């Protein structure tokens, strides 16, 4: 019996919400020999890629990168910002919001789910009421998935931010942008997001395996008192490294790909990229 794999018949097109199809130029950018991650050539690639991701996030805050899927960035956000027994609110929007909540429970956090119909999305008034009732400020963080891959539900992050502000509550605001970044308008600094969870395999057009968190100054201050156990994802350790984003070996080929993907976004124009996704999404719905 032959063990030879059959040759693909034409170009493989992946009709899936993610991972997504990877542009040829991104694949070609990654097709190169390995390089020392301290080599000046790679440091320039790294810096260009990070600056490009900040542009897409619309932020000036610090980014931490991981050799991990989005689940790794989820875990990094929780363990670097919170302590055992901390109470958090998770806004239900579908499978992945529930999985993030389950991960938080696994780390010993007190998770309160703001329940919602997966077809209609969160009731912002319910969040406002929950925070208003929390006079002791026991809630340490609010977690939301910007775009729920499983249901296609998009949450109004700006409205959620306004609801938190209206109550004067000091809770951190954590947002998962894994399936929205580079496809939907997202403004980390303007919307005062304390921790953004992102991944490369969707709007950033990379293979799976790279994720990251963007962290505000308020988030970094909370990190200094967070007591959940961590090591590989520890931001304090990362900040001591030359590239200030990794523990262990950097995935150099992925950064070459990321440099090309953010170049493609800048070439088309971020607003044009978002408008294109908006048109295609509406065409799909109709």
Feature-to-residue mapping (PLM):
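A glycine-/small-polar-enriched, mobile loop at the entrance of the PLP active site in fold-type I
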Residues: 11-67, 71
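Conserved beta-loop-alpha segment that forms the PLP phosphate-binding cup at the N-terminus of a helix
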Residues: 60-89, 93, 97-102
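Active-site phosphate-binding strand-loop segment of PLP-dependent enzymes
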Residues: 122-182
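Active-site C-terminal subdomain of aminotransferase-like
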Residues: 21-22, 201-285
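Conserved active-site segment immediately N-terminal to the catalytic lysine
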Residues: 189-201
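Basic/polar N-terminal segments that are highly enriched at the extreme N-terminus
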Residues: 1-10
């Amino acid at each position: 019996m032959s063990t030879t794999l059959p040759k693909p018949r034409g170009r493989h097109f992946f009709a899936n919400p993610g991972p997504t199809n990877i542009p040829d130029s991104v694949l070609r950018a990654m097709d190169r020999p390995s390089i020392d991650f301290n080599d000046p050539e790679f440091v320039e690639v790294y810096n260009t890629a990070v600056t490009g991701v900040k542009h897409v996030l619309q932020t000036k805050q610090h980014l931490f990168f991981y050799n991990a899927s989005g689940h790794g960035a989820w875990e990094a956000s929780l363990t670097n910002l919170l302590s055992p027994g901390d109470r958090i609110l998770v806004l239900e929007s579908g499978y992945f919001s529930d999985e993030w909540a389950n991960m938080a429970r696994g780390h010993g956090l007190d998770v309160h789910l703001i329940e919602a119909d997966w077809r209609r999305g969160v009731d912002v008034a319910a969040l406002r009421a929950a925070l208003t009732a929390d006079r002791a400020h026991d809630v340490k963080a609010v977690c939301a998935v910007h775009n729920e891959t499983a249901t296609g539900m998009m949450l109004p992050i700006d409205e959620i931010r306004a609801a938190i502000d209206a109550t004067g509550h000091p809770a951190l605001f954590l947002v998962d942008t894994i399936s929205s970044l580079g496809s939907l308008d997202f403004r980390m600094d303007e919307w005062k997001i304390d921790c953004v969870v992102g991944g490369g395999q969707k709007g950033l057009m990379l293979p799976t395996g790279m994720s990251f968190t963007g962290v505000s100054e308020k988030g970094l201050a909370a990190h200094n008192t967070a007591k959940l156990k961590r090591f590989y994802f520890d931001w304090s350790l990362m900040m001591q490294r030359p590239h200030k984003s990794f523990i262990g070996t950097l995935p150099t080929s992925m950064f070459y790909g990321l440099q090309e993907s953010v170049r493609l976004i800048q070439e088309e124009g971020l607003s044009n990229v978002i408008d294109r996704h908006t048109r295609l999404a509406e065409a799909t719905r109709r």
